Regions:
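Short beta-to-alpha transition helix within the HATPase_c
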Residues: 66-84
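Conserved ATP-binding N-box helix of the HATPase_c
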Residues: 18, 23-39, 102-134, 162-163
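ATP phosphate-binding glycine-rich loop and adjacent ATP-lid/helix-beta elements
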Residues: 154-181
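C-terminal edge-of-domain segments
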Residues: 176-194
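DHp/HisKA dimerization-phosphotransfer hairpin of two-component histidine kinases
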Residues: 27-63
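Conserved beta-strand-loop-beta-strand hairpin that lines the nucleotide-binding pocket
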Residues: 93, 122-156, 186
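Conserved signal-transmission helix
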Residues: 1-15
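Conserved catalytic submotifs in the C-terminal HATPase_c
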Residues: 89-96
Length: 194
């Protein structure tokens, strides 16, 4: 049995859950478009189709960051987790292979940061927690911006600082983390190879 096939059979339940969620989302899109067509609301249908197209483009940008583990993590996160909604935006083309740090280290740092936020979420929330992760390339650095709307323990700041410190100069906080009663914001930078 090929390695890829073995992986699929070993993780069948998880893969089926992801595929079912993806199929469900696409069927919802088709139902909305069908309803607009039946009601003769063509402009609303066009606007909705534009929204679906932008979502597909966003997913394509995530898939092209040249870090398959992180792309898969981002693209499957919401299908596998219910406690926090994660939205990822890639503002400019990002190529993780151009970083000074290894791709696996970048994956570990970003995914662990999200895991820390997830772990430190307060159990009682006013609204469902929503995290926007924005990646972009500028001036020979890649930036990762985390913007959480939701209540999270203040302990997360210290753990994120330790996580960055453990990567010995391969990552740094751009500014102080901002923690309020309703959210948390941090921006990290990662130097590219010269």
């Amino acid at each position: 049995m090929k390695d890829e096939q073995k992986f699929i059979t070993d993780h069948a339940d998880t893969l089926l859950r992801i595929l079912n969620q993806d199929r469900h989302d696409w069927l919802n899109h088709l139902q909305v478009l069908h309803a607009y067509l039946k009601l003769g609301r063509y402009q609303d249908g066009e606007a909705y189709l534009q929204k679906v197209t932008e979502e597909a483009h966003r997913e394509s940008m995530i898939a092209r960051i040249n870090c398959s583990r992180l792309s898969a993590f981002f693209l499957t996160f919401n299908a596998l987790n219910r406690d926090i909604l994660v939205e990822v935006e890639v503002k400019t083309q990002v190529d993780v292979t151009k970083l000074e740090m290894q791709s696996d280290s970048f994956f570990y740092l970003i995914s662990t940061c999200i895991g820390l936020l997830q772990h430190h979420l307060h159990t009682e929330q006013v609204e469902h927690p929503h995290l926007v992760v924005t990646l972009f390339h500028s001036d020979n650095e890649v930036f990762a911006n985390f913007d959480l709307e939701g209540q999270v323990s203040a302990l997360v700041a210290g753990e994120v600082e330790k996580l960055i410190h453990d990567h010995k100069g391969m990552a740094k906080l751009v500014s102080e983390q901002i923690h309020t009663d309703t959210g948390w914001i941090a921006e990290m930078s990662f130097p590219c190879k010269m």
